[in-house]
């Protein structure tokens, strides 16, 4: 058995995907695409190391604590160089997380060809007429290069150290005189780049119909001379709430609930009160940015429930406006948002009119890419 490590490249921003969710976080069943693609390859072979390159290493490690995670670079090549620093095996197999349908047949053809060259590459032929600019070219000479690509580790490290930019491993290997062997690729191994490419994974399992629930709690004390804002609604009252931001304690609790349901930490981690750029910032903005983060990793909000505990001011007549503000900010139906207001019957710091406390809960489900 060959000594091989696996590198999965997944540090892209999905800028061409044009959906709120990054493609690496589309769910196949309950697994995100990057994990599904990695498990798929690891089912075919016992790798010395499995290394995933990402810009979300801390979050990804929750899903696969036995993998190694490496921060991505500015380019694919930078990302690969970062990952290669952890590789000590004789061979390294490099693939993209956006190729979830690599077959066992293709994989084993690559491994079996290892003795043929320093780098083994799957490539597709083209059936259509091809042009380069205004000139027709011989399509028999055109190859569409795919991954995974198998290389000798020492040679690939050398190839990438030159400073030249290459779009795949085989190009770098060829540039240093290493031998490259092409095998026939597989249509199912085509890369998902655009949302229209989702048809390529239409045979895979749709996202599980799971529900994820998070809770949030926050407290702010009253402060003279500040405006009072709750759920994005400015309220006529003699006190505002002491805070680094605009002090919207209700939205802070809701933001924590949404982040918690996705396992993404809390509002203080995303928007620390030690950062001056968040000074007096609108909590509507913070909520929207947090929700974008939640959407990017494959979730959508199904409903939210907020309980505001305030002895004063009276809020019952403002609840519908508060719900509408949240619904508009998150582009949801108001029927998905519920705001309640209560007192503590004169008990505690809320009862003494020293501040306001809020509890919130939120539920999320997976983004359903099969309905696009």
Curated annotation (Swiss-Prot):
<protein>
    <recommendedName>
        <fullName>Bifunctional enzyme IspD/IspF</fullName>
        <ecNumber>2.7.7.60</ecNumber>
        <ecNumber>4.6.1.12</ecNumber>
    </recommendedName>
</protein>
<dbReference type="Pfam" id="PF01128">
    <property type="entry name" value="IspD"/>
</dbReference>
<feature type="site" description="Transition state stabilizer">
    <location>
        <position position="16"/>
    </location>
</feature>
<feature type="region of interest" description="2-C-methyl-D-erythritol 2,4-cyclodiphosphate synthase">
    <location>
        <begin position="212"/>
        <end position="372"/>
    </location>
</feature>
<dbReference type="InterPro" id="IPR026596">
    <property type="entry name" value="IspD/F"/>
</dbReference>
<comment type="similarity">
    <text>In the N-terminal section; belongs to the IspD/TarI cytidylyltransferase family. IspD subfamily.</text>
</comment>
<dbReference type="Pfam" id="PF02542">
    <property type="entry name" value="YgbB"/>
</dbReference>
<feature type="binding site">
    <location>
        <position position="349"/>
    </location>
    <ligand>
        <name>4-CDP-2-C-methyl-D-erythritol 2-phosphate</name>
    </ligand>
</feature>
<dbReference type="InterPro" id="IPR036571">
    <property type="entry name" value="MECDP_synthase_sf"/>
</dbReference>
<keyword id="KW-0511">Multifunctional enzyme</keyword>
<dbReference type="GO" id="GO:0008685">
    <property type="term" value="F:2-C-methyl-D-erythritol 2,4-cyclodiphosphate synthase activity"/>
</dbReference>
<keyword id="KW-0548">Nucleotidyltransferase</keyword>
<keyword id="KW-0479">Metal-binding</keyword>
<feature type="binding site">
    <location>
        <begin position="342"/>
        <end position="345"/>
    </location>
    <ligand>
        <name>4-CDP-2-C-methyl-D-erythritol 2-phosphate</name>
    </ligand>
</feature>
<comment type="pathway">
    <text>Isoprenoid biosynthesis; isopentenyl diphosphate biosynthesis via DXP pathway; isopentenyl diphosphate from 1-deoxy-D-xylulose 5-phosphate: step 2/6.</text>
</comment>
<feature type="binding site">
    <location>
        <begin position="266"/>
        <end position="268"/>
    </location>
    <ligand>
        <name>4-CDP-2-C-methyl-D-erythritol 2-phosphate</name>
    </ligand>
</feature>
<feature type="binding site">
    <location>
        <begin position="244"/>
        <end position="245"/>
    </location>
    <ligand>
        <name>4-CDP-2-C-methyl-D-erythritol 2-phosphate</name>
    </ligand>
</feature>
<feature type="site" description="Positions MEP for the nucleophilic attack">
    <location>
        <position position="191"/>
    </location>
</feature>
<feature type="binding site">
    <location>
        <begin position="218"/>
        <end position="220"/>
    </location>
    <ligand>
        <name>4-CDP-2-C-methyl-D-erythritol 2-phosphate</name>
    </ligand>
</feature>
<dbReference type="GO" id="GO:0019288">
    <property type="term" value="P:isopentenyl diphosphate biosynthetic process, methylerythritol 4-phosphate pathway"/>
</dbReference>
<feature type="binding site">
    <location>
        <position position="352"/>
    </location>
    <ligand>
        <name>4-CDP-2-C-methyl-D-erythritol 2-phosphate</name>
    </ligand>
</feature>
<feature type="site" description="Transition state stabilizer">
    <location>
        <position position="244"/>
    </location>
</feature>
<feature type="site" description="Transition state stabilizer">
    <location>
        <position position="23"/>
    </location>
</feature>
<dbReference type="GO" id="GO:0016114">
    <property type="term" value="P:terpenoid biosynthetic process"/>
</dbReference>
<comment type="similarity">
    <text>In the C-terminal section; belongs to the IspF family.</text>
</comment>
<dbReference type="InterPro" id="IPR003526">
    <property type="entry name" value="MECDP_synthase"/>
</dbReference>
<dbReference type="GO" id="GO:0046872">
    <property type="term" value="F:metal ion binding"/>
</dbReference>
<dbReference type="GO" id="GO:0050518">
    <property type="term" value="F:2-C-methyl-D-erythritol 4-phosphate cytidylyltransferase activity"/>
</dbReference>
<dbReference type="InterPro" id="IPR001228">
    <property type="entry name" value="IspD"/>
</dbReference>
<dbReference type="InterPro" id="IPR034683">
    <property type="entry name" value="IspD/TarI"/>
</dbReference>
<feature type="site" description="Positions MEP for the nucleophilic attack">
    <location>
        <position position="139"/>
    </location>
</feature>
<feature type="binding site">
    <location>
        <position position="218"/>
    </location>
    <ligand>
        <name>a divalent metal cation</name>
    </ligand>
</feature>
<feature type="binding site">
    <location>
        <position position="220"/>
    </location>
    <ligand>
        <name>a divalent metal cation</name>
    </ligand>
</feature>
<comment type="pathway">
    <text>Isoprenoid biosynthesis; isopentenyl diphosphate biosynthesis via DXP pathway; isopentenyl diphosphate from 1-deoxy-D-xylulose 5-phosphate: step 4/6.</text>
</comment>
<keyword id="KW-0414">Isoprene biosynthesis</keyword>
<keyword id="KW-0808">Transferase</keyword>
<keyword id="KW-0456">Lyase</keyword>
<feature type="binding site">
    <location>
        <begin position="271"/>
        <end position="275"/>
    </location>
    <ligand>
        <name>4-CDP-2-C-methyl-D-erythritol 2-phosphate</name>
    </ligand>
</feature>
<comment type="function">
    <text>Bifunctional enzyme that catalyzes the formation of 4-diphosphocytidyl-2-C-methyl-D-erythritol from CTP and 2-C-methyl-D-erythritol 4-phosphate (MEP) (IspD), and catalyzes the conversion of 4-diphosphocytidyl-2-C-methyl-D-erythritol 2-phosphate (CDP-ME2P) to 2-C-methyl-D-erythritol 2,4-cyclodiphosphate (ME-CPP) with a corresponding release of cytidine 5-monophosphate (CMP) (IspF).</text>
</comment>
<feature type="binding site">
    <location>
        <position position="252"/>
    </location>
    <ligand>
        <name>a divalent metal cation</name>
    </ligand>
</feature>
<dbReference type="InterPro" id="IPR020555">
    <property type="entry name" value="MECDP_synthase_CS"/>
</dbReference>
<feature type="region of interest" description="2-C-methyl-D-erythritol 4-phosphate cytidylyltransferase">
    <location>
        <begin position="1"/>
        <end position="211"/>
    </location>
</feature>
């Amino acid at each position: 058995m060959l000594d091989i490590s696996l590198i999965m490249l997944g540090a892209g921003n999905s800028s061409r995907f044009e959906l709120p969710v990054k493609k690496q976080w589309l769910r196949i069943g309950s697994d995100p695409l990057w994990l599904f693609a990695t498990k798929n390859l690891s089912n075919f072979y016992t790798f010395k190391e499995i290394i995933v390159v990402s810009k979300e290493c801390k979050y990804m490690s929750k899903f696969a604590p036995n993998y190694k995670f490496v921060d991505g670079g500015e380019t694919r090549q930078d990302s690969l160089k970062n990952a290669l620093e952890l590789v000590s095996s004789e061979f390294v197999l490099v693939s993209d997380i956006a190729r979830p349908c690599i077959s066992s047949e293709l994989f084993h053809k690559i491994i079996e060809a290892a003795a043929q060259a320093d780098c083994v590459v799957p490539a597709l032929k083209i059936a259509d007429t091809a042009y380069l600019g205004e000139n027709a070219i011989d399509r028999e000479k055109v190859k569409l290069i795919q991954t995974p690509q198998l290389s000798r580790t020492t040679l690939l490290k050398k190839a990438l150290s030159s400073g030249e930019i290459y779009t795949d491993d085989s190009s770098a290997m060829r540039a240093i005189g290493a031998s490259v062997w092409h095998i026939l690729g597989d249509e199912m191994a085509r890369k998902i780049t655009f949302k229209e490419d989702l048809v390529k994974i239409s045979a895979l399992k749709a996202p599980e119909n799971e529900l994820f629930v998070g809770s949030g709690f926050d407290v702010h004390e009253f402060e003279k001379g500040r405006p009072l804002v709750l759920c994005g609604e400015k309220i006529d009252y003699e006190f505002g709430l002491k805070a680094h931001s605009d002090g919207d304690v209700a939205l802070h609790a809701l933001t924590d609930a949404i982040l918690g349901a996705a396992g993404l930490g809390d509002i203080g981690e995303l928007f620390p009160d030690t950062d001056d750029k968040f000074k007096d910032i609108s909590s509507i903005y913070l909520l929207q940015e947090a929700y974008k983060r939640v959407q990017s990793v494959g979730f959508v909000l199904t409903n939210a429930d907020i309980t505001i505990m305030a002895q004063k001011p009276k809020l019952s007549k403002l609840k519908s406006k508060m719900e509408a503000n949240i619904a508009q900010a998150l582009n949801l139906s108001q029927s998905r948002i519920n705001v309640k207001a209560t007192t503590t019957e004169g008990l505690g710091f809320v009862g003494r009119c020293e501040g306001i406390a809020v509890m919130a809960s939120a539920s999320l489900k997976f983004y359903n890419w099969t309905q696009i």
